[in-house]
Amino acid sequence: MKFTELTVTEFDNFVQNPSLESHYFQVKENIVTRENDGFEVVLLGIKDDNNKVIAASLFSKIPTMGSYVYYSNRGPVMDFSDLGLVDYYLKELDKYLQQHQCLYVKLDPYWLYHLYDKDIVPFEGREKNDALVNLFKSHGYEHHGFTTEYDTSSQVRWMGVLNLEGKTPETLKKTFDSQRKRNINKAINYGVKVRFLERDEFNLFLDLYRETEERAGFVSKTDDYFYNFIDTYGDKVLVPLAYIDLDEYVLKLQQELNDKENRRDQMMAKENKSDKQMKKIAELDKQIDHDQHELLNASELSKTDGSILNLASGVYFANAYEVNYFSGGSSEKYNQFMGPYMMHWFMINYCFDNGYDRYNFYGLSGDFTENSEDYGVYRFKRGFNVQIEELIGDFYKPIHKVKYWLFTTLDKLRKKLKK
């Protein structure tokens, strides 16, 4: 085996293998994204004795104090069950970094630590991957910990994932809780549609994202941050928009209303109606009253807000391994139409149609108590019967130890001065 720099082609060919469970940050498209952010990129990996790539990682080189922080965002990519391979990688990486002006290195691999069901009950027969964590520590890495909160300096450590293997949309939907099924069906009955946005329409996503940002108070990303991905990831970034055409909805409602009124009139015309028939008439009267109310509201909304209402939108990444929900927004004013539910249902079906076995709702804090900052997000994802995946976390290692001590000391002083 040998540790070496890789070409873009070598790197790309390797990470395209879905069995390696790579992340959307460990793809060739992210090279240009990181370069656009002003960072150099280096591709490092291992080749076996037949010159075949068996490990790969995309590193950003972040200039710091005359040296570089080497950060492999969600790397490296390899068969992490092969502890001997991981051991060799970490040993050889250390040698490489000592020769290439590294201040310290950060790794946050897309590697599983533990697996749970939606209620945070560990899967039977699964064990915590402490062997990997201990292996990193044996190479001098500091573990950032088994965190259970969001941290702006770290990638998420907990995820909610739908395993689609061996399922169909119909069988999968049966595993959702009653609220998820009901709200998806509501959106379908409203006639909510979903389409993918082009780059020149991306402002429609941003409008919904900014509205949600203001409402929820989360840490937002800039427009340029999103456009950087849109411009570099090509067809690996997907932006669905859930919307409703009120003109079509009003027409559908009117047709249904006419049908119910005709049925009611026919039943009323019969003589000697039974109690059962009278109950049916009463039920139809309720439905007619409801539809008339809906028709009036939809007509008024169309006059004030226009016939097309944008309900929800999201940014997704698709790579060889999965489709991953990255970020999204929705309109609170139109939440009756269940736009987010339709968007997720559409994208789940996209996975089935395009051969993906994983639909990743992505981030959770890891605090699943009712007082947690994202308990509502957890409940939403839990309702889809997700499996909860816990990743092994962040690892740091100083390479230039004297300069790293100075760097951390100055950083602590800066933080004290800010306070």
From Swiss-Prot:
It is found in: Cytoplasm. PROSITE patterns: FEMABX. It is an enzyme of class 2 (transferase). Gene3D superfamilies: 1.20.58.90, 3.40.630.30. GO terms for biological process: cell wall organization; peptidoglycan biosynthetic process; regulation of cell shape. Belongs to the FemABX family. This is Aminoacyltransferase FemB. It comes from Staphylococcus aureus (strain bovine RF122 / ET3-1). The gene is femB.
